[in-house]
Amino acid sequence: DLDASEINLALADYVYLKGNFTGSLTGSQNGKQYAIYNLAKPLFENLKSGSTISNIDFKDVNIVGTYDSAALARNAENARITDVSVQGRVSVVGNASNVAGLVVNGTNTQITNSSFTGTILSNNQHIKAYNVGGLVASLKGGESLLSQSKADVTNISGARSNEQRIGGLVGRLENNARITKSY
């Protein structure tokens, strides 16, 4: 297991790992399951083509961001996320922004057998457009699929216009992205 609170982030750091990630991260080895505890920022900035995240738990997450926030990544493009669970709280303060439990923006990304349990808080002081989702704030592209996943989320939002979209699983689903067997 890894305790993210042992990593010193500067106030200006908005993620733990900046830039593009194209590798794989798995939380299991030799039959043992591992977790990352106490995330205070999203783990990745960008998951890019070929990246895979699997079999990992994020526990006691407490993220307070000022812009696009989620536990795993701000952006996932052509990524594969399987058997990932997040437990805790993710919030944005300041300017209205996108927020989700797992990934902020997913494009042509497949998320399978993953979950979020906890609270998502979005700023309610502005009327700027934003998306809030239990798992993904915005999921788009014909190759995007959210399947066999769930969110048990308390969503605290103060939407003031029809440009502020809030969903239990996904805040905004577009461009032929699909959800199957998820709740």
Question: What is the meaning of each model-derived region?
Answer:
Residues 1-183:
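Surface-exposed repetitive/solenoidal architectures
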